[in-house]
Amino acid sequence: MEVEERRRADGEVVWVSVVGVDGCRSGWFWVCLIRSGVWKVGIERNFRQIWSQWHEADSILVDIPIGLPDSGVADRLCDREARNVLDRPRKSSVFPVPCRLSLDAATYQSACRINKRFTGRRLSKQSWNIAGKIREVDELLRSHARAKGVVREVHPEVLFWALNRGLSMQHNKRTEDGFRERLRLLELRYPGSLAIVTSTLDTFARKAVGRDDIMDALAAAVTGRLGRRSLQSLPEHPERDSTGLPMEILYYRCEPGSEQPACRA
């Protein structure tokens, strides 16, 4: 698979690149796949720095909820469909997202009260722990029109399910078996994944970025490269929130029975 290039008005060649992003202990970890054998990784403290660096990317796929309920809906349709395609216990990794108004709460208790008032459901601890990151991405998308077509939501377990031809991962991603299972799949779909992961593990301390964060971001980047013209979404026809942001989870499915080659970007 050849990577496209385009020329700007000044004649400079710009390679079409895809970026996969996942939140990590020190901010945001990203993987950029540029062209065959050319990749970059890094960590940024906030999401605006990622957008500033990669705003010319073909796509930025991020593991964070985009498109938030305001009231009346306790669960997005995309989250329900994601749980439906995943086997137990992977489906438990998809948890309800907070309503937009709860993102500004100062405490977990306050966020729970706000969320229950507008959606009828308290907030999970998992949702509260990423509320700050959800707010970062939400604020960026609402203030940059172009970002809305570039920064898109993914969920790692859905990505691996799709890359694995509709079969969920068998092991928890934080276990050794789970790490190896996911790495084997990524290496099959994108030869060179092992080198990317090995180099990243050698470069950054685990207190900065976890091993599972690296795998999740790489899965997003590989998905963006493999399916850049044919990404699918859950649901097929996404709902939009009150600000116009899509409530969707993107993926690229390698169909069962097909002779799907490994992705050579």
For each predicted feature, which ranges?
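RNase H-like (RuvC/DEDD) metal-dependent nuclease/polynucleotide-processing core
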Residues: 3-6, 11-19, 23-265
